[in-house]
Amino acid sequence: MQELGSRTLSVLAPRVGTVTISPSSAAELTLSERDHGVAARVLSALAGPDARLRADQERAVAALVQPGARVLVVQATGWGKSAVYWVATALHRARGRGPTLVVSPLLALMRDQVAAAQRAGLRAVTVNSGNVDQWSAIEESLRADEVDVLLVSPERLANPGFGRRVLDHLAGRLGLLVVDEAHAVSDWGHDFRPDYRRVADVLRELNPDTPVLATTATANARVTADVATQLGEATLVLRGPLSRASLQLAVLPAMAPLERYAWVAEHLPTLPGSGIVYVLTVADTARLVDAIRAVHGPDYPVAGYSGGLPVEERERLEDALRDNRIKALVATSALGMGYDKPDLGFVVHVGAPPSPVAYYQQVGRAGRGIDHAAVGVLPSGADTGVWDYYATSTLPDPRQCEQILGALAAQPEPQSVVALEASTGIRRGRVELMLKQLAVERAVSREVDGWVATGRSWRYDAAHYDGILAGRRREAAIMTDYLAGSRCLMELLAMSLDDPDAGPCGRCSVCTGALPDGWSTAPSQAVVATVAQVLRAQHQVLEPRKMWPGGASGLRGRITAGELASPGRVLVHTDAPEWAAARAGCLTLDAPPPPELTEAAVRALVSWRGQWSERPGVVVALAPTGLTQVATGVAAHLAAVGHLPYVAWPLPAAAASLESDREAAGAAQVQRWSELLTVPESVGAATAGRVVLLVVDASSSTWSITVAARQLRRTGATDVLPLLIHRRP
């Protein structure tokens, strides 16, 4: 007889201090013979005719059919958490109760869950940003009680329109509420999402008899306690061992950024089966795919994956990997929680995540249904800088929160994010983050027409957020120990999750003293050279900004055609590994550009000129970040090669500090750049009546380029073609 998964149960009531169901009473929870029949039908549809609930899964299901039950399941990937809520759903529906609401964090995860529920004989639907045209029909089916399972994202749960139309109707008659990946509810967790706190509001609005299940594979003792507290006093916590016997973990020696790309390209064909190569940024997904194809040819079966792709494209790529039609997806963390491919043969990380818990969650995609999967990480000294950014980027800034609350209090009507950006001078992304954090503490509320202050007093809890930051830094320290190979890798991951059963695995590169068969400690230099050559020949399109930010800038609405730059080109995009030496040298220290950078600029113009309406008539050098030697060096070289006149546009020293201000809103930047970027007489005379090739040293926001193009057009330039040497993160 087949059982779903192979983990044993540990009921850890004393560890979290919020559980009132004792281990002995939990052990007494069983299903009736009739319920076993329903469960058998669901499980046979999911996993074959011999599938049965194990004793630990049965206890969870038996608890969930009790009125008002609160259950938190912390079990390793592959244990069968989803089987618990599909069986519980079937039992509730058999009793004539309402549908199950599943809160799930990712579209990829929701799609897999819908497919699994449908295999189990349940009518499952999802409401998400990718199926807006189906919302009305889905809501009508819900009102007619024709849906067994509704899956939504936490962001959808927080949407006031959805709450009014759907949640208010369901709250009193839900059969079961499921919070998947529940560690995201806790701001002590590695993947806290403020919108998940909307779950607490749903709990308060629920019929108190509605059972609630929260599931995760990545919660340490503190996160477990926090989630259990939010669920309620009588929460039953079911927790099992988290080590994964099928995974062979390995840490490779530190390599230069380009060497990591080359290592993946060289070793990918030898890795078992199909798998995932995780990278830290969206830009890395495209660059690494190009590096792999540079070595193995343009038709090599590999593709990039990120949350920015259209839903249909993500689904196509997920299916291609699931069906082994491609060797690997090079992916950001958007392909993570819940992606279901039991025979995933490998996971390789190019750059380490900031948290061992996040790392455990991602490598947990591998080896779920096979005996062996290879897992490796290629660390870099640059990883710690990324970790520092993520440690603080989601924490509220008290000054910005007070500004936003003041702006809301000053207006009688709901305010949009755009309006708040303009009135506070805080950039849009930070406004959105602060609003979500303030909404968690109910200081603001999102209405249909915008955001309003609730009138509830708000105080920045410095001790709480200092504790969160300290916790994240402790996790980063554990990740540093992991990369240093200080002890068994699986044991260290399990210990980071407070697993009492953690112990040496006997399989990892620390336990064996060796890398997996066929893995080298460095790539061949020939492969490194091939990858460098191909990547340095590529250039990204720089799309011009088309709208003014409004606010203090005094400029609002669409940028007129007579003030607009044409699409440009970028030579070095963010942290491009092929340009690591230049980024550490002239693009940081303001030194003359190396020959490979000026040659790349010439190649960019050669490939770009087919899109020009007219050939440039003059080259202008502009250095808003103060890298004057870089801007003038590249501009002068291009002018000499193209036999064009060349002129430098000098800027005051204050310009560099403005370009480096990451917190300044667009309106504030445009206002200051408009003051700083007055066109000198020499530049105006050289550019009037001509197409300008504008060579810019570096920029992050590109507002300096937008304003410079406007000023040049207003003083007579017929067009502006920006060549941005370094697009900063």
Predicted feature locations:
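PRPP-dependent phosphoribosyltransferase catalytic core
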Residues: 706-729
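Interdomain "pre-motor" coupling segment immediately N-terminal to P-loop NTPase/helicase cores
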Residues: 5-31
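Helicase motor core with emphasis on the C-terminal RecA-like subdomain
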Residues: 28-36, 41-45, 51-82, 87-93, ...
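Active-site-facing substrate-recognition patch
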Residues: 247, 531-618, 628, 632, ...
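Active-site signature of alpha/beta-hydrolase-fold catalytic machinery across serine-
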Residues: 86-87, 91, 226, 633, ...
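A glycine-biased structural micro-motif
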Residues: 413, 687-690
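Short glycine-rich phosphate-binding loop at a beta-alpha junction
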Residues: 211, 614-626, 693
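C-terminal accessory region of SF2 helicases/translocases
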Residues: 348, 352-361, 367-568
